[in-house]
């Protein structure tokens, strides 16, 4: 997001003015540059490697090409551009203690920075809304959000992000009017992101606070729905254990179906944990920076510049966390293993929808057993029965179980 008044550089190198030996000071300064260079290089590698792996997996394996994963691809693209075009130049700015790429690239680089941050955060918000509809309206979800609609939503996210970034920056609407900012704008080696209050507040609202409010509301609804589902399962378990033993013996599938339903609903715990990780990481990485971003334009001297830039980099690191958070599913893990040549041929791998043929294409195992990809519901939190088809004994609805007794109503593409 740029660096305001970066006269004292982020994570300052040791100051040798008080050291008795200038040679020792130089060595410490060089060691600092090398150490920070290694750390920043690792951050760049983590961002690029993780997001390239996500994009490649979704593009290569049909099993992963779901509506939700369209949004994951958009998120990974934003994070990948961040790792390729933003973080390396930011690292150079810090390590060299000056900007060496000229005024034009300074503003263009800043625009890309704001674009990627905004697109990444707003895509997270869209994913939250996607999960909300998948959980609250599972049997209408596929008609509510088709792949074409998902493409339109992604396009709108990038348009809004572009309007927030390139337009005001390239038109110089963001510029402050005090003398220090004017001097920086005119200097080729200065790329400190001085902004006026209107732009700082408006961009923070669009890029962070509004998506955060939406995410908090959506995920609170998700937790409410999940809690009701768990209560429903508890009630159905009580009815199940109250059944007459002879009735269970007459219908041997009843007990097996109930156990399958209960096991299926244990996925809620994993999904709730994932939602907590998503919210916690998102908030921890970006909330401190955007608070400081508002405070900084209101009271310039209150927040040290080093703190501002450090928090900005904590936000950058979020781009490396996203692949880990959103790719916890078995489908992604198997895809990653196959891409990295780490997967051994096994029945388990085939059972998860990946073949071991020469061209490494994925063959969804369900196609051979009546559980087609197109018939799946893109939700893993579901414990509800279709309207009007609820089993009084708490079993999985018959229309969601294939001929081999497997549940075909969900997919592990996200949670």
From Swiss-Prot:
It holds the Pfam family 7tm_1. Glycans are attached at residues 6, 15. The keyword Ligase does not apply. Palmitoylated; may reduce accessibility of Ser-345 and Ser-346 by anchoring Cys-341 to the plasma membrane. Agonist stimulation promotes depalmitoylation and further allows Ser-345 and Ser-346 phosphorylation. It is a multi-pass membrane protein. It comes from the Eukaryota. Residues 59-71, 130-150, 221-274, 330-415 are cytoplasmic. GO terms for cellular component: early endosome; Golgi apparatus; plasma membrane; receptor complex. The gene is ADRB2. GO terms for biological process: adenylate cyclase-activating adrenergic receptor signaling pathway; negative regulation of G protein-coupled receptor signaling pathway; norepinephrine-epinephrine-mediated vasodilation involved in regulation of systemic arterial blood pressure; positive regulation of autophagosome maturation; positive regulation of lipophagy; positive regulation of MAPK cascade; receptor-mediated endocytosis; regulation of smooth muscle contraction. This is Beta-2 adrenergic receptor. One of its GO terms (molecular function) is protein homodimerization activity. Residues 395-415 have a biased composition (Polar residues). A lipid is attached at residues 265, 341 (S-palmitoyl cysteine). Gene3D superfamilies: Rhodopsin 7-helix transmembrane proteins. The chain crosses the membrane at residues 35-58, 72-95, 107-129, 151-174, 197-220, 275-298, 306-329. Its main location: membrane. Keywords: Cell membrane, Disulfide bond, Endosome, G-protein coupled receptor, Glycoprotein, Golgi apparatus, Hydroxylation, Lipoprotein, Membrane, Palmitate, Phosphoprotein, Receptor, Transducer, Transmembrane, Transmembrane helix, Ubl conjugation. A motif (PDZ-binding) lies at residues 412-415. Beta-adrenergic receptors mediate the catecholamine-induced activation of adenylate cyclase through the action of G proteins. The beta-2-adrenergic receptor binds epinephrine with an approximately 30-fold greater affinity than it does norepinephrine. The modification Phosphotyrosine is found at residue 141. It comes from Canis lupus familiaris (Dog). The modification Phosphoserine is found at residues 246, 261-262, 345-346, 355.
